[in-house]
Amino acid sequence: MNRKAFIFILVIGIFGLGSCLSNKGAVDSHNSRNSLDWAGVYTGITPAASASGINVRLQLNKDNTYELTYDYIDRPGNSFTNTGSFKWNDTGDIINLGIADTPSYYKLAENKLIQLDMSGKEITGNLADYYVLKKN
């Protein structure tokens, strides 16, 4: 009888240890895309070379479409709107609007978007804080 009990405990131990080890390779799948309430309207004023600034309005929709409007301050009637679909990067924290010749990478954070440079890197320096759009 002791032998059967020993074998039973051994089998249970092996299965228990196996289930613990199988979780070791699990990857944390939490990212901005699936953890944040990212859909909505983001606004801010970004620097401009030929105007006092640019009023930026970016609407992100749950179906991965967007509407981006640039309205140049001190230049009435100089407004541009782009619409289309955006793509997520592999890690789910950066979107690309896919607009040629325009910065179209944005990093998602809690209730804000951080505009990235043309190559998808964070803008640094004195003006970096001006490239943040806040969620309305």
What are these regions (language model features)?
Residues 1-5:
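Positively charged n-region of N-terminal signal peptides that target proteins for export
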Residues 21-24:
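Bacterial signal peptide processing site
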Residues 26-43, 58-61, 81, 134:
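N-terminal helix-cap/turn-to-beta initiation motif at the start of protein domains
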Residues 16-19:
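C-terminal motif of bacterial Sec signal peptides marking the signal peptidase cleavage site
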Residues 6-14:
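Sec-dependent N-terminal signal peptides
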Residues 80-88, 120-136:
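Edge beta-strand at a domain terminus
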Residues 76, 81-85, 91-110, 115:
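An anionic, turn-rich surface loop/hairpin at beta-sheet edges
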Residues 52-90:
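N-terminal glycine/threonine-rich, aromatic-flanked beta-hairpin/loop signature
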